Every structure is written in structure tokens, then in C-alpha cells.
């Protein structure tokens, strides 16, 4: 066939045209020519991407997101560090290191089927390919919003399990930043190089916030006056924000926000004053979230999202003869962690509790947090004393959802929440008798011993 012959390509939703010379080196396409026409069950935008690759407009990397389609046309990829996987019958071409580091599922998957490297597509992973595509966008793009369904799918793939068990041997608890602490966005920085008073890492997104812990007490003003940051070995004084002194707990903790307009990823080097001793025990965290300051308190604007080990649903059976509902906090913990897991923790924190009722109004109800200071018995109502009174605030847009409005003070967060155990109870006092189940959605964070 002459190279200048016009070939019409009927896609699944439109029609395209190209010269025979453009597709001549693709036997999978040329073999389908009938009357100078090719009919394909391929979306137009995908076919345009493939034709632009044949036209040398785009590199082969441009086709990675549509590896499933490219493979059907005989286009194979061969880049070091990349592998094929099969999600729900759709083939993805992904970076192996990224998948292993971010998703615990694939760390085990690649290890178990190592003999198949680099083509694991013969093993079906029976999950939704559309949700997996969203997960890939989340892993590779900054400021990517996730739906609740996608968050649940992340749990299936064991997304960064280290998020849920933070090792803090040298430190106590946060005062104001409990919401930050529970944020799904936190990631351990495991590739950070700590040498003397210098920390080196890589900034992968346009904005990262680093939570940094120190072994000794620190002076915020000294840090602000003496800290230095280099981006790609160039001194920078505009990309640093150390949050105010009120957000330091035990004088061992700060937030640093780094922003860069440089081409990403870029190398970051943070140098602290000589008197500063940095902890190297997995105590550096990075996150990519927006934060705003309200009444002197930094709040994570995405803190309402729940993830694995957070947001479990707990059903409470209520005696219809009572005008109050009593919930042992221990039940909230054992509903998530088994006894073997709990034994590994020094504390488990519970926060962000939302009550969901079944067509029943909790209007006029109020909440008390009580504690038995005499013994460790689980049923401690008789000897308990009230340590905090809280109000129930109706969640926006819902008639049946109520959030506990805890008094947000340093003393309460520090002295109560970190010590939740079997002798704490949440008591909901009602105006009317309650009938039916009560559902709770809440967060937990486990602190290793």
C-alpha cells in the first residue's frame, strides 16, 4: 500500500484519519485495514495518543497511562524499574519502587511473584481498575482529592501502613495538633539522611509540611533565626515557615512548611543550629495538606477524612428504659485492635467521634466524659467522676449525624485523650428515651511502646 494512502480509523465514539506511513510499523493496525478503513473498539482520545506516538510527537512514556490499550496494538514498554500489573482485567504499567514503597499490598505481591518480573499481568488482581487509576493519580500528583470510596480502596492495598503506628519513644503527646496527628495524609520519611545537624531529603510535591521532633528542648526563636534551607544547593529564605511557639509540645516539636517553584522533584537540605540534637528514630514526617489558623490553633482542613484504623463503625445497643447511653471507651478501642495488638501499644487515642442515629433526634442531648479514678474496672459508672462536659453539634447537611464538640484546651487534650482506657466512659444524656441502634464513626491512633 502506498505510504500516502489515507486510512480512516473508526473508534468507539468518533472517526480519525491518518496516512498509511504513520501506522506502517504497527502490524496490529495494518492487518485490520479493510477498504482503507480500520474499525477499533478504542476511545478516540486514546487512539489520538497512540497516533501521536507514531508521529513522533510524544514519547512512549506518554502511553504509560493507557498501557492496556497500547498492548492490544502490540506496543510494548521496556523501561527499567517499571512493570505490568493486571487490575480487574486492565493492564497498568507502573513504577515498581513507587508501588512497593507506598502500597504494602504490592510489596508482598512483587516478592511472592518475583519470577514474573517485569510482567505480572498474568496474575489477576480482582479489584476495580477505575479506582486503581484514581489511586495512581493520588500517589503521583500533589493536592489530589479522594472520595470516600477511593480511601477505602487505599486501605485494601495497605496504603503506607506505617501511618497508623507512629513510634515516638522520646516524646509525649501533642497538645493542639491531635487532628493533624490523625490525618491520613501523614507519611513517614524513611529516605531522609540525618547527619549532625543537617537533614537531607527530596521535595516531591509543590508543598510539603514536615513535622520535626528533637531529643532536647528547643527554643523556637533560636531556630527561626539560625535555621537555613537549601533547594537544589541554592540558599533560600522564602520557603520556610516555622509555626508559632504555641504549637510546640514538650518543647520538642515544630512544623516546617516547604514550598518550591523549582522543577520537581528537587533536593532539600535543612541545617539547624549547632545546639540542636535531632532524633533519628523515624521521627520525621511529611504531609501535603492545606492548613489554616483559627483562634491560634492550626487545624488540618482535610482532617474530616477517615482512613484505615480510623472511621470504623461501632453499633451500640441501648436499653429503651434509660434516658442515657453509656459507651465504655475501651469498647471503641477493642472494636478496632485485638488484644495482641493492644499489648504492643503504650496508648491508643480516640478522637473525632460522630454519632449517627436511625431517624432519631438527639436534640437537647449533652455528653459527659467520665472516669473511674479508683480502679481499672470496665463498668465504672458507680464510682466515676465527670471530667469533661461536651455538647453535640449536628453535622452540616445531615439530620442524623452529631459530632461531639470537645472543649479544645491544652489541659484536656494532653491529660485526657492520651490516657483513654477501660475506665473511661462516654455518657450521652438524652431528653427523651432512645430506641434503636446508634452508630459511631471515630478516629484512633496507636502509639507504640
From Swiss-Prot:
Residues annotated as domain BTB: 79-148
InterPro entries reported for this sequence: BACURD1-3, BTB/POZ_dom, SKP1/BTB/POZ_sf, T1-type_BTB
One of the GO biological process terms: protein homooligomerization
PROSITE patterns: BTB (PS50097)
UniProt similarity note: Belongs to the mimivirus BTB/WD family.
Protein name: Putative BTB/POZ domain-containing protein L742
Species: Acanthamoeba polyphaga mimivirus (APMV)
Amino acid at each position: 500500500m502506498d505510504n500516502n494512502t489515507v486510512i480512516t480509523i473508526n473508534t468507539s465514539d468518533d472517526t480519525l484519519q491518518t496516512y498509511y506511513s504513520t501506522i506502517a510499523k504497527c502490524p496490529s493496525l495494518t492487518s485490520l485495514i479493510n477498504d482503507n478503513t480500520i474499525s477499533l473498539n478504542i476511545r478516540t482520545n486514546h487512539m489520538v495518543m497512540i497516533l501521536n506516538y507514531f508521529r513522533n510527537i510524544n514519547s512512549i512514556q506518554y502511553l504509560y497511562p493507557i498501557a492496556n490499550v497500547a498492548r492490544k496494538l502490540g506496543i510494548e514498554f521496556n523501561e527499567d524499574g517499571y512493570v505490568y500489573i493486571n487490575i480487574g482485567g486492565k493492564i497498568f504499567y507502573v513504577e515498581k519502587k513507587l508501588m512497593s514503597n507506598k502500597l504494602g499490598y504490592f510489596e508482598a505481591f512483587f516478592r511472592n511473584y518475583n519470577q514474573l518480573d517485569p510482567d505480572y499481568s498474568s496474575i489477576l488482581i480482582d479489584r476495580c481498575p477505575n479506582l486503581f487509576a484514581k489511586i495512581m493519580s493520588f500517589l503521583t500528583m500533589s493536592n489530589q482529592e479522594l472520595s470516600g470510596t477511593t480511601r477505602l480502596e487505599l486501605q485494601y492495598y495497605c496504603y503506607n501502613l506505617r501511618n497508623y503506628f507512629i513510634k515516638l519513644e522520646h516524646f509525649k503527646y501533642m497538645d493542639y495538633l491531635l487532628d493533624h496527628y490523625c490525618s491520613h495524609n501523614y507519611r513517614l520519611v524513611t529516605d531522609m539522611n540525618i547527619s549532625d545537624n543537617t537533614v537531607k531529603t527530596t521535595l516531591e510535591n509543590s508543598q510539603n509540611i514536615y513535622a520535626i521532633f528533637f531529643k532536647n528542648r528547643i527554643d523556637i526563636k533560636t531556630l527561626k533565626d539560625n535555621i537555613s534551607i537549601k533547594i537544589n544547593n541554592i540558599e533560600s529564605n522564602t520557603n520556610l515557615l516555622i509555626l508559632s511557639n504555641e504549637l510546640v509540645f514538650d518543647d520538642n516539636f515544630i512544623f516546617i512548611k516547604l514550598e518550591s517553584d523549582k522543577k520537581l522533584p528537587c533536593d532539600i537540605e535543612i541545617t539547624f543550629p549547632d545546639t540542636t540534637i535531632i532524633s533519628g528514630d523515624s521521627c520525621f514526617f511529611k504531609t501535603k495538606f492545606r492548613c489554616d489558623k483559627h483562634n491560634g490553633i492550626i487545624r488540618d482542613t482535610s482532617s474530616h477524612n477517615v482512613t484505615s484504623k480510623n472511621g470504623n463503625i461501632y453499633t451500640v445497643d441501648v436499653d429503651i428504659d434509660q434516658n442515657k447511653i453509656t459507651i465504655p471507651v475501651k469498647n471503641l478501642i477493642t472494636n478496632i485492635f485485638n488484644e495482641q495488638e493492644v499489648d504492643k501499644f503504650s496508648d491508643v487515642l480516640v478522637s473525632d467521634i460522630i454519632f449517627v442515629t436511625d431517624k432519631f433526634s438527639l436534640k437537647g442531648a449533652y455528653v459527659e466524659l467520665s472516669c473511674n479514678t479508683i480502679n481499672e474496672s470496665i463498668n465504672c459508672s458507680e464510682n466515676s467522676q465527670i471530667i469533661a462536659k461536651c455538647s453535640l453539634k449536628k453535622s452540616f447537611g445531615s439530620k442524623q449525624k452529631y459530632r461531639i464538640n470537645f472543649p479544645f484546651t491544652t489541659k484536656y487534650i494532653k491529660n485526657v485523650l492520651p490516657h483513654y482506657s477501660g475506665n473511661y466512659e462516654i455518657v450521652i444524656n438524652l431528653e427523651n428515651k432512645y430506641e434503636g441502634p446508634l452508630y459511631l464513626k471515630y478516629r484512633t491512633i496507636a502509639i507504640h511502646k
